[in-house]
């Protein structure tokens, strides 16, 4: 009603007036910090996606509107294969001729908080298995190369759960750099020096203990 009054009863102008007001409000929300959100994993038609989308509050992160938005973004990534978040913003939104970027202001208004698509990973080869922990606080996507038609779903799920629990920095020892090993060794020696039982031990003994720890790292 207010829009019609402002536009002298012109319906088309009223719609445009409302749209402009909505975009202005969305722009104001865009400056607010989006530190909450959720991760979502999607696997379909041989493609695996995990995406993180942020909002402002935990309450919003659990809302049906926000969850539906995150799922739509995952579907866009799976179907249109954008290279990065910038490219994703130029993709067509699900069931629309508008791009993700053009759709964002309306989503910000309907959901009521600033929204940010933080990051994503997409695999289109081998077998992808997704796992989401703690209601979307942690999202993992594992991509496995299998032979002989083996169903790797259960293995992939177990690996994904381990990753969610332990947050490993590397897949195997070959990926661990000398710099990382040197830093871990330095930390281990420093911790030993703070332990009265270990601090008095000879350096050679400390070195041997640390090397044992490094083999387990």
Name the predicted role of every residue range.
Residues 1-217:
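N-terminal assembly/interaction segments in proteins that build large macromolecular machines
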